[in-house]
A protein has these predicted regions:
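Conserved redox-active cysteine motifs that mediate thiol-disulfide chemistry
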Residues: 6-20
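Class I S-adenosyl-L-methionine
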Residues: 15, 22-26, 80
Length: 86
């Protein structure tokens, strides 16, 4: 499974989310590959996954089918809960 992190360099909420997301993924020791997707540079991926706002984080299975997503900033507690049943 993969974690698709849609962001933009100019997006302050994206900048705030990134280290917290990395920390939670590392703590959980999940078998997930994180892929950072710069929304401005990869519009095709944004269209494919219907990303309308950033930050957006999408978990996809090995066939690139969406499992779950969230949009906006999350606290560390929220992220732990989000990844708890993956």
């Amino acid at each position: 499974m993969k974690v698709l992190d849609f962001y933009a360099d100019w997006c302050n909420p994206c900048k705030a989310l990134a280290p917290v997301l990395d920390k939670v993924l590392e703590e959980k020791k999940l078998n997930l590959t994180k892929i950072n997707i710069e929304e401005d540079d990869d519009a095709d991926m944004s269209v494919k996954y219907n990303v309308r706002n950033i930050p957006t984080v999408i978990v996809v299975d090995d066939n690139d089918v969406e499992v779950k997503r969230f949009t906006g900033t999350k606290t560390e507690v929220d992220l732990r809960e989000f990844f708890s049943n993956i």
